[in-house]
Every structure is written in C-alpha cells, then in structure tokens.
Amino acid sequence: MNNSHADVGLVIAVKRLTAAKTRLAPMFSARTREDVVLAMLVDTITAAIAVPALRSVLVVTPDEDAADAARQLGALVLPDPTPQGHHDPLNNALTAAEVVARRENTNVVALQGDLPALRTVELAEAIGAARAHARSFVTDRHGTGTSALFSFGAPLDPHFGLDSAQRHRRSGAVELTGDWPGLRSDIDTPDDVLALNDLGVGPATARAIARAQ
C-alpha cells in the first residue's frame, strides 16, 4: 500500500456480522454464518489490497470483529457513523467513508465485502477500465446488483441496494463489461455459494465453509 503512483482509495462497508447475510440461514447456522461472512471479508481485502493502484483500503463498520480483521490486513477502519434507524444505512456508511478516503485520494472505489473469489488482477483491470469515465460500475453475476462502483474525479454517489445496477445506470454511471467473474460473484444466497464451486475461493472462506460441513 506504499506505491507512490497509487491514486485510488477503496472503501468497503460492513454491517454487524450478527445481522449479515440472513438469506444464508438455510445453509449455515447463525454462528457459522458470521464466520463465513468475516472470512469473505478477509479474502476480499486480501485480494484488493494487493492492487498497485490502491493507496488505501478503508472499512467502515460498527462491528469490532470485522474492524479487527481489517486492521490486521493493513486496512484502515472507520466506525460506522450511521444512526440507528437510518433509512439508507449502506449508502450513508459509504458516503461517510468516501469523505475520509478523499482526504488522500482524488479517486474512490466502493467495493462489496463479500467477494471471496475476487482476484487481484480482476480488480486491477476494472480500475484501469474505470479510468476512462467519471463514474462507472460493475454488476454482479445476475446483472441486477452492483459489485463495485468507481469514481474518478467525481462524487461517488452510491446507490447500492435493491436493483442497484439500474439505479447506478440511471444516475449516469457507465457499466463496465469486462470478464471478471470473481469480481462479479458477491454472496447473498445459498445458490451464490454453490456457484463458487466453479470459481474457487480464497483460503479464509474455504476454511470457514469446510468447518461448516
């Protein structure tokens, strides 16, 4: 993270592990689900932090376990300032993280924290493609969600949530069309987990899933 030519700050928002990925309940117990979610974050940060263009990785979260894991990997941590009951907690957290990231970076990327199959080269290539646009995004494998949102010299203006791909498109962000299967494979459902069999996952996620079997 000490590349003098790096000019991008990456932000990841993580909710409390006890409240994360409830749609995985048919596959994992509550305790195992927390372990898997944390492991996916570890693998995501590990892949991302090796991208040469990144000057910093900042995780915004209210969860101490997630914060500790992020720090151990060399990421910065911002306690989530979002008040309880906020109508749009994810995008509020990302906007708060963007403010901090822009203290040192003109360009900011918001990345999902549940990309256990992410490869460093995929994110590096996507950032390279994103440089041609003020704002751009990469959809998830279903084409409806957003795995990453990029801003180069422009406000991030995040619209994550239901139908986020369409919302980002309508906001003027350009859709990037590269072949980045790991970058597109965020995990929300048991079917998403099963789809990882064709891609492979990072070591932390592999261990967490193996312990659950």
From Swiss-Prot:
Keyword Zinc-finger: no
Biological pathway: Cofactor biosynthesis; coenzyme F420 biosynthesis
Gene Ontology annotations of biological process type: F420-0 metabolic process
Top-level division of the source organism's lineage: Bacteria
Catalyses which reaction(s): phosphoenolpyruvate + GTP + H(+) = enolpyruvoyl-2-diphospho-5'-guanosine + diphosphate
GO molecular function, one term: GTP binding
Group of enzyme by EC: transferase
Function: Guanylyltransferase that catalyzes the activation of phosphoenolpyruvate (PEP) as enolpyruvoyl-2-diphospho-5'-guanosine, via the condensation of PEP with GTP. It is involved in the biosynthesis of coenzyme F420, a hydride carrier cofactor.
Family statement: Belongs to the CofC family.
Name of protein: Phosphoenolpyruvate guanylyltransferase
Record organism: Mycolicibacterium vanbaalenii (strain DSM 7251 / JCM 13017 / BCRC 16820 / KCTC 9966 / NRRL B-24157 / PYR-1) (Mycobacterium vanbaalenii)
Gene: fbiD
